[in-house]
Amino acid sequence: MKNYRTESDSFGEIQIEEKFYWGAQTQRSLENFKIGKQKMPEILIRALAILKKCAAQVNHEFGDLEAKIAISIDKATDRILEGEFEDNFPLVVWQTGSGTQTNMNMNEVIASIANEELTGKKGGKSPVHPNDHVNKGQSSNDSFPTAMHIATVLATKQQLIPALNNILTSLQDKSKDWDKIIKIGRTHLQDATPLTLKQEFSGYITQIEYALERIENALQKVYLLAQGGTAVGTGINSKIGFDIKFAEKVAEFTKQPFKTAPNKFESLAAHDALVEFSGTLNTIAVSLMKIANDIRLLGSGPRCGLGELHLPENEPGSSIMPGKVNPTQVEALTMVCSQVMGNHVTVTIAGSNGHLELNVFKPVIIYNILQSIELLSDSVNSFVTHCVKGLEPNIARINDLRDKSLMLVTALNPHIGYDNAAKIAKEAHKHGITLKEAAKKLNLLSEAKFDKIVVPEKMVSQS
């Protein structure tokens, strides 16, 4: 049999199962928003706990929160950050667009934990009040966007940047000895002039290097925190200097360069910084989609495709075709990239709906950004472990395709002109003969002269 306790808010009393620490506003949200199963991300909950910890410390230093209350709030946030109360944050993303219910969920749980420590009884509003003490000098309108920024930075630094460094290092290590492997290039999916396999992979490496640079650039505005703007950006009920001191506390605790936002009206009414950051995630997805698809194409086969790369064989690929093995890691990564691109569309629409003094699409913005970070990080690490590290060049196939290519004729352009070189290529293709045979047949070039000019090793750099 379940035990219940009575909590209350401005709408009256409500029953809450005794084992949970939340209060009336959280319970009402649970009952009013039975929509989907997409709960607020765990890292956002952690960001809110960090926020409440730092706010309590500043309020105490400013003389607005007595030591006993401040210490109890500080201890409660520590326990939350240690993962002790994970089942006490049950609210879904689909709630008020300001994130008020989740902000109050945190306020109520912290107050309840603190009250239990001080009185032996969870819940209630005394001696620690969820609004008057835990939420002191704050509004959901500045607290939730602050938590959004903290969560984005932490997720990026803890998950995404390490994952991108992982694939960067793996691509560098894998391709470092491929500078002597000369293969045929392809443009428009048609044969082109040669390059080395290392040169081809250097393009992918640079894309990842640029991705890391883009992240650092986009994070600069995400480091700016809205806290101190309170309801509409004026800072009502927040003391002068609270915003600066708060940002310093968060920076110290997280070891990240957070600062107070110079204009709180912008920080509450718009989320351009997060839209920009989502755009960076979208660009990373574009880069990864290109890299993964190239590896998919280069590994196509095993007998009837390009077959220039051997991809690791991790599991059976077909329920009907015996022996078939598919590029499953590529498929997983490219599906993630598709999801991230879709997430950015959602963030773009949500970011554009900042009406007057407050954007009220905050939960869906942060949900999609954090999902994109998590999916990109996990899929990249999986791709590295189960695909990139096991890539091997198929030297025989690479050499065969290169030597058959008609585009080696490009080396003849400076010597016999574009039109004559084109005649050789067309003649070779039409009659199924080699370029050398076609050149001799058309009396355009001797075999000796051809062999001196058409050297793939000399075609992979400027003359």
Swiss-Prot record:
Q: Which GO terms describe its biological process?
A: fumarate metabolic process; malate metabolic process; tricarboxylic acid cycle
Provide the residue positions that the database annotates as binding substrate: 98-100, 129-132, 139-141, 187, 319, 324-326
UniProt GO cellular component terms = cytoplasm
Which pathway does this polypeptide act in?
Carbohydrate metabolism; tricarboxylic acid cycle; (S)-malate from fumarate: step 1/1
Which transformation does this protein catalyse, written as a reaction?
(S)-malate = fumarate + H2O
Q: Where is the signal peptide?
A: none
Instruction: Decide whether keyword Transmembrane helix is in the record.
Output: no
Question: Which class of enzymes does this protein belong to?
Answer: lyase
Mind telling me which PROSITE patterns this protein's record contains? FUMARATE_LYASES (PS00163)
Under Enzyme Commission nomenclature, its number is 4.2.1.2
Annotated region Disordered: the residues are: 121-141
Q: Does the keyword Transferase apply?
A: no
InterPro entries in alphabetical order: Fum_hydII, Fumarase/histidase_N, Fumarase_C_C, Fumarate_lyase_CS, Fumarate_lyase_fam, Fumarate_lyase_N, L-Aspartase-like
Family membership:
Belongs to the class-II fumarase/aspartase family. Fumarase subfamily.
What job does this protein perform?
Involved in the TCA cycle. Catalyzes the stereospecific interconversion of fumarate to L-malate.
Further comment found in the protein's record: There are 2 substrate-binding sites: the catalytic A site, and the non-catalytic B site that may play a role in the transfer of substrate or product between the active site and the solvent. Alternatively, the B site may bind allosteric effectors.
The record, for HAMAP family, names: FumaraseC
Under which name does UniProt file this protein?
A: Fumarate hydratase class II
Source species: Rickettsia conorii (strain ATCC VR-613 / Malish 7)
Q: What is the lineage of its organism?
A: Bacteria, Pseudomonadati, Pseudomonadota, Alphaproteobacteria, Rickettsiales
